[in-house]
């Protein structure tokens, strides 16, 4: 029996207050021979076993009835592989001792994690099934530098924090432990004695899978295999590509009619994916799928940044959905939330008893609008956690793009704050320099590590250079949502047509700054909630005029420079606001052909026509790709412009935003010849009045608008038409 183990040490171990379990537990060399110590609550008998022979080589004596065992093997001097035969409740179990294994994290990994430069921290931290010294199990590691003790608790140890206290790697603040026998599918958490002596139970920040709310445990789950993007997927994100995005909330796109329950990832793969393909969209954008506790946050308050939500199935089911989208030729964009996280006790908030992931001062670390906490981007381990997450989704799931939510709230310290409620940066300014550097670094790493993948910014201010390279002072995003265009055009469209002539600039102003960024034109989920009404319901007039206005607006939007984004339901003119707790109003498309079918057909035709003609997308961000033909006819609310591709092919776009047909409307053109009407939002095919130009019109050598040749058209009421030059 050992006399060297102090009673206070045993008490501290059993009470869960001992920070260095490996200094006591496991096998140790002593003058009397090898000494084996184990903490095995509720055990009654413990033997040391030699695995090769199965022979008992020594019995451990119970030094404390609460489960501390110790024994000396006097004839042994060199460490050897051993097992423990433990009797619990009259039944003997053969186990491998977690405390006989050496350090898990390599020194280089520990150094990179501490420096915040480990590109893929998720390959080291978290829970990873592994085999060590011939023993299968799971290695656990978690960053909690200020905790006094950390244990792994889970289904494999009765959720008992005494059984598996972890080793602290002081140089990095990471706790680690290999637990033999712990396997994929088992639930676990980390139990911490925090910096203040309080007990905390935390989910794993790096968990690859988690329980569905209201449960909060993490799940042991293997790291997904890497996904290699195809050349076609890489090209589909380029600036000259047609990009038409269908924005979807997976929980409310469609539901089971019998119980209003969600569709699974696999059901969505079978229903949503072919629908989006049929509609002609090029990209699917998913509202956040990271695990989150509150349905009403729509995923924008995530607690499991590395775990796809279990609401719709398993992690592998989600991969199945992504693969189905790719097989259908759809790229997938994931809404990504690196700006803030909820204050739920089981998550990142005060993780080790200190403000580890967030700022300690609420003027920097608390988001008043959303009652959430703000990441401390200046802490290297925190920014590393987030940058690694971006790579994780792209490399391990094949996500083609990330849309970063609420960028303005990240880059401005005074965002939504009054004077005295925020702290200036080191230079006295309002910019969050650490957040700006984090975004630049993330975008740089995406570009270097995942060729063809891109990022998009929802940035609501006039911050200069969101889509410009960091070396020129930009943030390095590929695309930025044009929220200014969206607000201006919706403000215009909601006006009674009689008043539109006084607000003509709302449609033209966007071109004054159009080439300052690479823009996406978004009609997103944010525009159909919180009392804003549906897009259809914002249109003025009676029912016929509402639909006509909407069709004209869509025709304008799809032709205007910039990539396109449409939230689900808008493609068939849903009449009510979006409700995340219910399905879209698919019943509007039941029965006979109606106005909703007309809008749906229009959006489908817009997508396919837009994709087919390079003039509509190839030079979105080049001044050569756009030219006004009629910009000043505010009295009749008529606007006409040309879209152009690199080869000089032109498409003419003409919009009449009044209910008065404009017959014999003459305007100058660049290229004389025969022009075909390839799209008319007033067509009877879309349930319009079918006013138009009979398919083909020829130019006249009559000067107009400063040009030698002109066209004489009929402009339908509340409509947009597209014309393509067919020849001389």
Curated annotation (Swiss-Prot):
Record-linked SUPFAM superfamilies: (Trans)glycosidases, E set domains, Glycosyl hydrolase domain
Active site per database record: 405 (nucleophile), 458 (proton donor)
Organism superkingdom: Bacteria
Classification via InterPro entries: A-amylase/branching_C, Branching_enzy, GlgB, GlgB_N, GlgB_N_E_set_prok, Glyco_hydro_13_cat_dom, Glyco_hydro_13_N, Glyco_hydro_b
GO biological process: glycogen biosynthetic process
The keyword Glycosyltransferase is assigned to this record: yes
Entry keyword set: Carbohydrate metabolism, Glycogen biosynthesis, Glycogen metabolism, Glycosyltransferase, Transferase
CDD domains listed in its UniProt record: AmyAc_Glg_BE, E_set_GBE_prok_N
Pathway assigned to this chain's UniProt record: Glycan biosynthesis; glycogen biosynthesis
EC numbers: 2.4.1.18
Keyword Glycosyltransferase appears in the UniProt entry: yes
Record Pfam families: Alpha-amylase, Alpha-amylase_C, CBM_48, GlgB_N
Annotated Gene Ontology cellular component terms: cytosol
GO molecular function: 1,4-alpha-glucan branching enzyme activity; cation binding; hydrolase activity, hydrolyzing O-glycosyl compounds
Catalytic activity: Transfers a segment of a (1->4)-alpha-D-glucan chain to a primary hydroxy group in a similar glucan chain
Family listed: Belongs to the glycosyl hydrolase 13 family. GlgB subfamily.
Subunit structure: Monomer.
HAMAP family noted in UniProt: GlgB (MF_00685)
Function: Catalyzes the formation of the alpha-1,6-glucosidic linkages in glycogen by scission of a 1,4-alpha-linked oligosaccharide from growing alpha-1,4-glucan chains and the subsequent attachment of the oligosaccharide to the alpha-1,6 position.
Protein name (database record): 1,4-alpha-glucan branching enzyme GlgB
Source organism (scientific name): Salmonella choleraesuis (strain SC-B67)
Gene that this sequence comes from: glgB
């Amino acid at each position: 029996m050992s006399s060297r183990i102090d009673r206070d040490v045993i008490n501290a171990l059993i009470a869960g207050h001992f920070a260095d379990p490996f200094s006591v537990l496991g096998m140790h060399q002593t003058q009397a021979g090898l000494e084996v110590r184990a903490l095995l609550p509720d055990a009654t008998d413990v033997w040391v076993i030699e695995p090769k022979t199965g022979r008992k080589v020594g019995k451990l004596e119970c030094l404390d009835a609460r489960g501390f065992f110790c024994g000396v093997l006097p004839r042994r001097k060199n460490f050897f592989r051993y097992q423990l035969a433990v009797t619990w409740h009259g039944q003997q179990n053969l186990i491998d001792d977690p405390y006989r294994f050496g350090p898990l994290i390599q020194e280089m990994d520990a150094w990179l994690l501490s420096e915040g430069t480990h590109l893929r921290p998720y390959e080291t931290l978290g829970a990873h099934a592994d085999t060590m010294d011939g023993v299968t199990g799971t290695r656990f590691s978690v960053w909690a530098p200020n905790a006094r003790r950390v244990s792994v608790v889970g289904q494999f140890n009765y959720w008992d924090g005494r059984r598996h206290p972890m080793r602290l790697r002081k140089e990095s603040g990471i706790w680690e432990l290999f637990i033999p026998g712990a396997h994929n599918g088992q639930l676990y958490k980390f139990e911490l004695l925090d910096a203040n002596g309080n007990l905390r139970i935390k989910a794993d920040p790096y968990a690859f899978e988690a329980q569905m709310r209201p449960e909060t445990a993490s799940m042991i789950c293997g790291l997904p295999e890497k996904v290699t993007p195809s050349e076609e997927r890489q090209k589909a994100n380029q600036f000259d590509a047609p990009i038409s995005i269908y924005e979807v909330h997976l929980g409310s796109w469609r539901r089971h009619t019998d119980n209003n329950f969600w569709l699974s990832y696999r059901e969505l793969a079978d229903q949503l994916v072919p629908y989006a393909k049929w509609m002609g969209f090029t990209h699917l954008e998913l509202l956040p799928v990271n695990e989150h506790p509150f349905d009403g946050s729509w995923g924008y308050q995530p607690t499991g940044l590395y775990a796809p939500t279990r609401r719709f199935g398993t992690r592998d089911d989600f991969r199945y959905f992504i693969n189905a989208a790719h097989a259908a030729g759809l790229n997938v964009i994931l809404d990504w939330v690196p700006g803030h996280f909820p204050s739920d006790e089981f998550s990142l908030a005060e993780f080790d008893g200190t403000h580890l992931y967030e700022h300690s001062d609420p003027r920097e670390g608390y988001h008043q609008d959303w009652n959430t906490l703000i990441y401390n981007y200046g802490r290297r381990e925190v920014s590393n956690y987030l940058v690694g997450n971006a790579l994780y989704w792209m490399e391990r799931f094949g996500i083609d793009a990330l849309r970063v939510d609420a960028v303005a709230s990240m880059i401005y310290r005074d965002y939504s704050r009054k004077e005295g409620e925020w702290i200036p940066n080191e230079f006295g300014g309002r910019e969050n320099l650490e957040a700006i550097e984090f975004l630049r670094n993330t975008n740089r790493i995406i570009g270097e590590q995942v060729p063809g993948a891109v990022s998009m910014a929802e940035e609501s201010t006039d911050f200069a250079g969101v889509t410009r390279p960091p070396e020129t002072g930009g943030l390095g995003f590929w695309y930025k949502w044009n929220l200014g265009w969206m607000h201006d055009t919706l403000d215009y469209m909601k006006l009674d047509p009689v008043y539109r002539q006084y607000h003509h600039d709302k449609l033209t102003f966007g071109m004054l700054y159009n080439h300052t960024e690479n823009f996406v034109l978004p009609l997103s989920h944010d525009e159909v909630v919180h009392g804003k009404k549906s897009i259809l319901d914002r249109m003025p007039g009676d029912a016929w005029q509402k639909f006509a206005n909407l069709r004209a607006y869509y025709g304008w939007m799809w032709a205007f420079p910039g990539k396109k984004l449409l939230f689900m339901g808008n493609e068939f003119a849903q009449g009510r606001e979006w409700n995340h707790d219910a399905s879209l109003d698919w019943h509007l498309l039941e029965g006979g052909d109606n106005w909703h079918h007309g809008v749906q057909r229009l959006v489908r035709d817009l997508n396919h026509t837009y994709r087919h003609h390079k003039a509509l997308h190839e030079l979105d961000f080049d001044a050569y790709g756009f030219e006004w033909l009629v910009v000043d006819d505010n009295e009749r609310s008529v606007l006409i412009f040309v879209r152009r591709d690199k080869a000089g092919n032109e498409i003419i776009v003409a919009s009449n935003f009044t209910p008065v047909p404009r017959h014999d409307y003459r305007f100058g053109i660049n290229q004389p010849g025969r022009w075909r009407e390839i799209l008319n939002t007033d067509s009877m095919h879309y349930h319009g009045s079918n006013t138009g130009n009979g398919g083909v019109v020829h130019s006249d050598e009559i000067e107009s608008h400063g040009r030698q040749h002109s066209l004489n058209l009929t402009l339908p009421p509340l409509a947009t038409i597209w014309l393509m030059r067919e020849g001389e």
